[in-house]
Design a protein with these regions (language model features):
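Glycine-rich phosphate-binding P-loop
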Residues: 15-33
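Class I S-adenosyl-L-methionine
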Residues: 266, 358-360, 377-390, 401
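Short secondary-structure boundary/capping segments
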Residues: 32-37, 133-138, 285, 334-340, ...
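GTPase G-domain guanine-specificity segment
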Residues: 327-352
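Switch- and interface-adjacent substructures of P-loop NTPase systems
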Residues: 2-4, 9, 35-314, 329, ...
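Conserved beta-strand segments of the P-loop GTPase G domain that flank and frequently precede/overlap
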Residues: 16-18, 270-273, 321-324
Length: 469
């Protein structure tokens, strides 16, 4: 009832921001808040473009037990000399942004300026991939995890853990040292599979990759075991120890996250690094498609009525953002959107059928490149110009992070289905490198100018524009 009463004074939108590792969640939140507070030019965000957005400012968040999103620290990273990307999301955090605006509705204007609270909830997308575990027993999860680790795209990364499977007898007495060693091998496999060159996405349990405040906890000290055809195991065995911890993980980690945070969201943006999956080849793209389907199925989506909006909110607007659009020439942005639409197509259709609005955008919350041209032979190529991060490579060239380069990233396929069928492995000239942030521009009045972006205003309009009418 507290949320209900406060909502009568100043409405609140709970905006979920998620995505898999390195997809740009932290940068998106920092850029969104900075642009709104600084009064940036946002032509496709109606309230700002029409001069109705009067002020934006931060306020104390309502959930005092949830860590605050460190906006000031992350902004400091982006405006440092040289600028650097902020650290990735590793746990759930929250930030309250309040907007004061003039309504388009006559009766609201008679009441003076209006206020809208935006409670931004930042959480790792890896945690969403845990929700399907709620319907799996430990035995079912173990069998699934072992089968997945034997797939061609994971086999190499899983080799050390796979080797240890044959050395562990699930009927042996429970041993903490054995459990820790075996769990560490499993976690190492998941981390290897997530990193380049594999760039895989569907790697639960999510807290094994993003432990948050549970790092080192016994709740994260378990791993799949091979039952070896046995139907039951003795009490006090390694199997029953692992099974008990798996069930505790679901009860004390997964369910509270769903109940206390995820189930209360009104709007959602999902950040997806499609280009990283394309770099990883067809297996990584196929795995991203599986992850997108699982993530979208987790959302309690649909249109809201008065009752549901107050007591059982549904996510009625979803933005799927193909991030790092600045790593491509704008001529390929529509193709990037088409690939993401193809990846999430079935799940999008279900959400739209339930009444939710879903929009796909090629986006860069902070634009790290500009566009240019380069000649190769007699051909003029559309390029992007920026500072590749140290260690990034194209062919035999390794960048040091200090030099500006014009790079031709290639063209995405006109048929998005080709991206799911191994197209990238046949086009070796395609390589998407990462760039450092742009140099900040100091303002004479103090502070820094908002960073250039690609379609950030369209994302904001889709997520909250209707609430500012």
């Amino acid at each position: 009832m507290g949320d209900f009463a406060s909502g009568l004074v100043a409405p609140t939108v709970r905006l979920g921001v998620t995505g898999l590792a390195r997809s740009g969640k932290t940068v998106f939140i920092t850029a969104l808040v900075h642009n709104l507070i600084a009064g940036a030019r946002l032509p496709f965000f109606d309230a700002a473009a029409q001069g109705r957005l009067l002020r934006a400012y931060l306020e104390p968040q309502p959930d005092e037990i949830v860590p605050r999103f460190p906006y000031e620290k992350h902004l400091g990273d982006l405006v440092a000399a040289p600028p650097r990307w902020p650290e990735s999301t590793r746990r759930i955090s929250q930030l309250r942004l309040t907007l004061e605006y003039a309504s388009t509705k006559f009766w609201k204007r008679q009441l003076g300026q209006q206020r809208l609270h935006i409670d931004i909830v930042d959480y790792p997308g890896e945690w969403l991939l845990d929700l399907p575990l709620l319907r799996l027993s430990y035995r079912e999860w173990s069998q699934t995890a072992i089968e997945q680790s034997q797939m061609a795209d994971r086999k190499q990364a899983a080799k050390p853990w796979q080797a240890s499977l044959g050395l562990v007898d699930p009927t042996d007495p429970a041993d903490e040292a054995v459990a820790e060693r075996f769990a560490d091998l499993f976690k190492t496999y998941l981390r290897e599979a997530r990193a380049d060159p594999y760039a895989l996405s569907t790697l639960p349990p999510g807290r094994f990759l993003m432990p948050g405040d549970l790092a080192g906890s016994p709740a994260l000290t378990f791993a799949p075991l091979d039952p070896g055809g046995r139907d039951s195991f003795p009490r006090g065995s390694l199997w029953t120890m692992m099974e008990r911890r798996y069930e505790a993980y679901k009860s004390h980690v997964v369910r509270p996250f769903f109940r206390d945070h995820f189930a209360r969201l009104d709007r959602q943006i999902v950040m997806i690094d499609v280009l990283a999956a394309l770099n990883g080849g067809q297996p990584a793209v196929a795995d991203l498609e599986r992850a997108m389907t699982e993530i979208m199925e987790c959302f309690r989506s649909g249109s809201n009525n008065l009752w549901s909006s107050l007591f059982a909110p549904r996510i009625d607007r979803i933005v799927l953002a193909a991030t790092k659009a600045d790593h491509l020439h704008h001529q390929s942005h529509d193709r990037l959107e088409a690939i993401l639409t193809k990846l999430a197509g079935r799940a999008m259709a279900r959400a739209e059928y339930s009444g939710a609005e879903v929009r796909v955008l090629a986006m860069a919350a902070v634009r790290a490149t500009r566009e240019g041209e380069a000649k190769r032979g007699g051909e003029v190529l559309p390029c992007i110009v920026g500072y590749p991060l140290a260690g990034e490579t194209i062919g035999k060239r390794t960048f040091d992070g200090n030099e500006k380069f014009a790079i031709f990233p290639g063209d995405l396929p006109s048929d998005p289905a080709l991206a799911l069928k191994g197209w990238h492995t046949e086009h070796g000239e395609m390589r998407f490198v990462r760039f450092r942030p742009p140099n900040p521009v100091a303002l004479p009045s103090g502070g820094f100018a908002p960073f250039p972006n690609i379609r950030l205003d369209r994302a904001i309009e889709t997520l909250i524009g209707d609430r500012l009418a």
